[in-house]
UniProtKB/Swiss-Prot annotation:
NCBIfam families: 3a0501s007. Keywords: Chloroplast, Membrane, Plastid, Protein transport, Thylakoid, Translocation, Transmembrane, Transmembrane helix, Transport. InterPro entries: SecY, SecY/SEC61-alpha, SecY_CS, SecY_dom_sf. Component of the plastid Sec protein translocase complex, which is composed of at least SecY, SecE and SecG. GO terms for biological process: intracellular protein transmembrane transport; protein targeting. It holds the Pfam family SecY. This is Protein translocase subunit SecY. It comes from Guillardia theta (Cryptophyte). Its main location: plastid. It is a multi-pass membrane protein. The keyword Transmembrane helix applies. It is found in: Plastid, Chloroplast thylakoid membrane.
Amino acid sequence: MNTSIKSIKKQDLKDRIVFTLFLIVMSRLGTFLPIPGVDHDAFYQSIISNPLVNFLNVFSGGGFASIGVFALGIVPYINASIIVQLATNSIPSLEKLQKEEGELGRQKIVQLTRYVALVWALIQSIGVSFWVRPYVFNWDLNFVFAMSLTLTIGSMLIMWFSEQITEKGIGNGPSLLIFINIISGLPKLLQSQIQSTRLNIQALDIFVLVFIFSVMIIGIIFIQEGIKRIPIISARQLGKGQMDNKTSYLPLKLNQSGVMPIIFASAVLVLPAYLAQLVSNEQLRTVLHLFDGTSNNKLLYLLFYFTLILFFSYFYTSLILNPNDVSKNLKKMESSIYGVRPGKATTEYLQKTLNRLTFLGALFLAFIAIVPNIIETLTNLSVFKGLGGTSLLIIVGVQVDTSKQIQTYLISKNYETIVR
């Protein structure tokens, strides 16, 4: 019987992995389907050094540079998630929907996010259709309609892929798709960087960069795995007046929000670059470039990026972990934190602890994200510039999160086997 259950468990995991890989392959195939009617070679040559396109390419796996069917990628969905989550904290009716209506409320919030993503994708696709006008062979309103419809449908498909991966596959769908898009561009990135710097690069430069990135990877794994264990005592233990040898703990991660603050902050950072493409006022464009990293003075950009990561770390953590809910659950289980009174005192203790952990985790995320920019500014070393702290955080963070999800899935199935 146990052998049969184990084989079913392994087959279920294999099915999830195969399903995830299938959707990943489909998302990559759509990236290489070009929109007809565009002079893609001329377009690529004109935008190869555009920071806005470079950023969007990270999220679309190169689809934006070639104006593929999936050129918008997961960006509209991410932006929609930010908008809806901000609205949820600001609008009482949405906040009530999320906190008091359980799974039904969550489904309504998800549906609202989809609608906002659809509108956002439509707006972006119309903007792109006007942006590529100089490179279109026969530009007219029919082309605008066809291209906008194609890009919007492509973005909605990517959104559906990401949701299906999260629900029926392995890993977090949006993060995993961004991860695949980043690593798909690594070979080309490494080749171009080596070719552009092989005449100037020194052996010491390579050693320094490899050392820095190695330290960053170790640090990212440390921050992803860091946990503060809070001892919990049950009513039975409390009645005895002492803790048992087998102490229970409430684990709080140092970085509750994973790589999502980085993704959200990056999505916001693209707005100044996008607006700079649209405005004609030179002074306003100069001000916008101070926030998109293309200005020679990057201090304001780095401060803006740093602040966004801190904000989204607190914001996203507040969405996924509510100290008041944890306090209520402990009370229902007739348990309490050792040395802390149940109820309001427990909520305040958890909130204080969570704030400290989030601050430390956010500081580290922000530091890792801006380190490559600081090194480039101080040393003028730009080797592997495209693989910045943001990309590195996403690559390592998603790998760690996905492996942990697989382990959790296997453990949960083992518990099911024991119960049976």
